[in-house]
Amino acid sequence: MIELSHEEELRYNRQIILKSVDFDGQEKLKASKMLIVGLGGLGCAASQYLAAAGVGNLTLLDFDTVSLSNLQRQVLHCDARLNMPKVESAKIALEQINPHINIETINAKLDEEKLAEIIPHFDIVLDCTDNVEIRNQLDRQCNHMKVPLISGAAIRMEGQVSVFTYEPNTPTYRDLSKLFRQNVLSCVEAGVLAPIVGIVGCIQALEAIKVRLKIGKNLCGRLLMIDGFSMNIREIKLPTNME
């Protein structure tokens, strides 16, 4: 059984005093294994709060390197680490945030066969990518392995978050993508305002913790939509098995 050190008890005190977390929940977070796919704006925001919250084992997956245009919103990276693999840059920053956790990196673009090999080793997967092909691969494999997927997206001044637990009669990312039949733009094409990716990434981290600890009401079956321009936040119910 994994236990907290005295220093960790002090570090996580403000979470431990929450009745829904307590010592048992914090120890469960320490024992947890989460995969973060994409270390751009969403992944940077989500990973730093998961690290700070004491998720004991984070694996960072990305195949890109840090560029100057990333620094406007990808807050774990910096000028000194330009051209460094994003996973290595993020690891350096996260280890400074919390030296008590274990951080592994995968600097590669994994095909679906390789994703199928690694996903069963995790309790939660966070989809922080802007790549439709990878999103669909993660959805298929997480669905097959019944590993919860926390999905986020942000563009312009808009963001969205949903949770897929793959329990019976719950929607998948495939259902969501069918609901929004449209061409997917990237930040390169449409632009993005920095704070919106932080908001979405933080919500992803929050939902990951809630799902792992089985607390609160998570976003399974719902899509949270954030319009930063008008500061309007709404949700829609997602259909299941949409043809």
Swiss-Prot record:
InterPro entries: Mopterin_Synthase_Sase_MoeB (IPR012730), ThiF/MoeB/HesA (IPR045886), ThiF_NAD_FAD-bd (IPR000594), Ubiquitin-activating_enz (IPR035985). Pathway: Cofactor biosynthesis; molybdopterin biosynthesis. Its EC number is 2.7.7.80. Keywords: ATP-binding, Molybdenum cofactor biosynthesis, Nucleotide-binding, Nucleotidyltransferase, Transferase. Gene3D superfamilies: NAD(P)-binding Rossmann-like Domain. GO terms for molecular function: ATP binding; molybdopterin-synthase adenylyltransferase activity; nucleotidyltransferase activity; sulfotransferase activity; thiosulfate-cyanide sulfurtransferase activity; ubiquitin-like modifier activating enzyme activity. Transmembrane segments: none annotated. GO terms for biological process: Mo-molybdopterin cofactor biosynthetic process. GO terms for cellular component: cytoplasm; cytosol. SUPFAM superfamilies: Activating enzymes of the ubiquitin-like proteins. It catalyses: [molybdopterin-synthase sulfur-carrier protein]-C-terminal Gly-Gly + ATP + H(+) = [molybdopterin-synthase sulfur-carrier protein]-C-terminal Gly-Gly-AMP + diphosphate. This is Molybdopterin-synthase adenylyltransferase. It comes from Haemophilus influenzae (strain ATCC 51907 / DSM 11121 / KW20 / Rd).
